Amino acid sequence: MWRIWRLFDPMRAMVAQAVFLLGLAVLIHLMLLGTNKYNWLDGAKKAPAATAVAPVPAEVTSLAQAK
Protein backbone atom coordinates (compact mmCIF):
# COMPACT_ATOMS: atom_id res chain seq x y z
CA MET A 1 0.00 0.00 0.00
CA TRP A 2 2.87 2.38 0.70
CA ARG A 3 3.96 2.20 -2.94
CA ILE A 4 0.79 3.93 -4.09
CA TRP A 5 2.12 7.17 -2.57
CA ARG A 6 5.15 6.92 -4.83
CA LEU A 7 2.77 7.32 -7.78
CA PHE A 8 0.57 10.06 -6.28
CA ASP A 9 1.59 13.16 -4.38
CA PRO A 10 -0.12 12.84 -0.96
CA MET A 11 -0.85 16.57 -0.68
CA ARG A 12 -2.48 16.72 -4.11
CA ALA A 13 -4.51 13.60 -3.35
CA MET A 14 -5.81 15.06 -0.07
CA VAL A 15 -6.66 18.39 -1.71
CA ALA A 16 -8.47 16.61 -4.53
CA GLN A 17 -10.38 14.49 -2.01
CA ALA A 18 -11.35 17.57 0.02
CA VAL A 19 -12.58 19.40 -3.09
CA PHE A 20 -14.56 16.36 -4.19
CA LEU A 21 -16.19 15.91 -0.77
CA LEU A 22 -17.02 19.62 -0.53
CA GLY A 23 -18.62 19.54 -3.98
CA LEU A 24 -20.59 16.43 -3.06
CA ALA A 25 -21.81 18.03 0.19
CA VAL A 26 -22.93 21.18 -1.64
CA LEU A 27 -24.73 19.09 -4.26
CA ILE A 28 -26.57 17.04 -1.62
CA HIS A 29 -27.59 20.14 0.33
CA LEU A 30 -28.90 21.89 -2.78
CA MET A 31 -30.88 18.80 -3.73
CA LEU A 32 -32.43 18.68 -0.26
CA LEU A 33 -33.25 22.39 -0.35
CA GLY A 34 -35.07 21.80 -3.63
CA THR A 35 -37.47 19.33 -2.06
CA ASN A 36 -40.63 20.25 -0.20
CA LYS A 37 -40.11 17.87 2.71
CA TYR A 38 -36.47 18.61 3.58
CA ASN A 39 -36.26 22.37 2.93
CA TRP A 40 -35.17 23.68 6.33
CA LEU A 41 -35.00 27.33 5.24
CA ASP A 42 -38.61 27.84 4.10
CA GLY A 43 -40.09 25.01 6.11
CA ALA A 44 -42.48 22.46 4.71
CA LYS A 45 -45.19 24.01 2.61
CA LYS A 46 -48.58 23.11 3.94
CA ALA A 47 -51.09 21.60 1.57
CA PRO A 48 -53.98 23.95 0.78
CA ALA A 49 -57.02 23.33 2.90
CA ALA A 50 -59.70 21.40 1.09
CA THR A 51 -62.77 23.55 0.65
CA ALA A 52 -66.15 22.06 0.06
CA VAL A 53 -67.75 23.47 -3.04
CA ALA A 54 -71.33 24.36 -2.26
CA PRO A 55 -73.80 23.88 -5.07
CA VAL A 56 -75.13 27.07 -6.57
CA PRO A 57 -78.77 27.42 -5.54
CA ALA A 58 -81.31 27.47 -8.30
CA GLU A 59 -83.03 30.76 -8.94
CA VAL A 60 -86.15 31.10 -6.90
CA THR A 61 -89.12 31.64 -9.20
CA SER A 62 -91.00 33.88 -6.80
CA LEU A 63 -88.09 36.33 -6.58
CA ALA A 64 -87.51 36.24 -10.31
CA GLN A 65 -91.15 37.16 -10.99
CA ALA A 66 -91.06 40.01 -8.47
CA LYS A 67 -88.43 41.90 -10.44
Swiss-Prot record:
It is found in: Cell inner membrane. A bacteriochlorophyll binds at residue 29. Changing residue 38 to F: In strain: DSM 149. Residues 1-12 are cytoplasmic. One of its GO terms (molecular function) is bacteriochlorophyll binding. Residues 34-67 are periplasmic. The chain crosses the membrane at residues 13-33. It comes from the Bacteria. The N-terminus is blocked. Keywords: Antenna complex, Bacteriochlorophyll, Cell inner membrane, Cell membrane, Chlorophyll, Chromophore, Formylation, Light-harvesting polypeptide, Magnesium, Membrane, Metal-binding, Transmembrane, Transmembrane helix. Coiled coil: none annotated. GO terms for cellular component: organelle inner membrane; plasma membrane; plasma membrane light-harvesting complex. GO terms for biological process: photosynthesis, light reaction. The keyword Magnesium applies. It is a single-pass type II membrane protein. Pfam families: LHC. The modification N-formylmethionine is found at residue 1. An alpha/beta heterodimer. The core complex is formed by different alpha and beta chains, binding bacteriochlorophyll molecules, and arranged most probably in tetrameric structures disposed around the reaction center. The non-pigmented gamma chains may constitute additional components. Belongs to the antenna complex alpha subunit family. Antenna complexes are light-harvesting systems, which transfer the excitation energy to the reaction centers. This is Light-harvesting protein B-870 alpha chain. It comes from Rubrivivax gelatinosus (Rhodocyclus gelatinosus). The lineage of its organism: Bacteria, Pseudomonadati, Pseudomonadota, Betaproteobacteria, Burkholderiales.
